[in-house]
Amino acid sequence: MQWWQILLIVLGSIAVLAVLTILLYKPVFKRFWDIVISFTGLLILWLPMLIIGIIIKADSKGPMLFKQKRLGKRKKQFTVLKFRSMCDHAYEKGGVATSEGDSRITKVGRFLRKTSIDEFPQLINILLGQMSIIGPRPILDWEYEEFADEKYEPRFKVRPGMFCTVDVKYRAEASRELQFQMDTDYAKHIKFSTDLKTFFGIIKTVLSGKSVYREENKNE
């Protein structure tokens, strides 16, 4: 087989995959790409993540990872994973609200939050099928109780995301109401183009250094 024939087969396969991804994104290929990206990400990042974990341990007492129960698809509870960015037992010392000057946030934690590197362990959640790369923000029980409303139910029919559409424009500046509304709108109209735009938008937002803090109910 000639090299150009191989090239045509490869390009044709890519074209077919691209078309199928666009046409069958929500029912099939969103999960397919979640698996591909999370598996590849963990394969590439396992050593840097291990080094980050060691640095976290050296910087302050406590575990490498922060674990917290969140509500996922169909309101099923799961344990979300993040690199620990606050001192151990931080919530016992000051509740869940944080601000930029919060003394509970470690030196390493400030950098992890600013760059969103603290979210990397969620690649494990994604590979396990508990989360998606892009989706509604995984919420706490009390948040659901506070904003329980039929109009927000569509957001619980899809997997929560490592990143969400709100992160692109507002990051931590959006109100809870706006967060829930945008998450619901996203869940109703999932498209490949939206996820792609959000993915690259997140990178731009992180590089811009937009605040990762808000005055009320900002969680680890």
What kind of feature is each model-predicted range?
Residues L65-R104, M162-Q181:
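Short, glycine-rich, amphipathic interfacial segments at transmembrane boundaries or analogous
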Residues P121-E220:
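Hydrophobic structural segments characteristic of membrane proteins
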Residues M1-L11:
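Feature marks short, highly hydrophobic, charge-poor N-terminal signal-anchor/signal peptide-like helices
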Residues I9-D88, F192, K197-E220:
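A hydrophobic, helix-centered structural microdomain
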Residues K26, K30, H89-K107, F111, ...:
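Cytosolic-biased juxtamembrane loops and peripheral soluble domains of multi-pass membrane proteins
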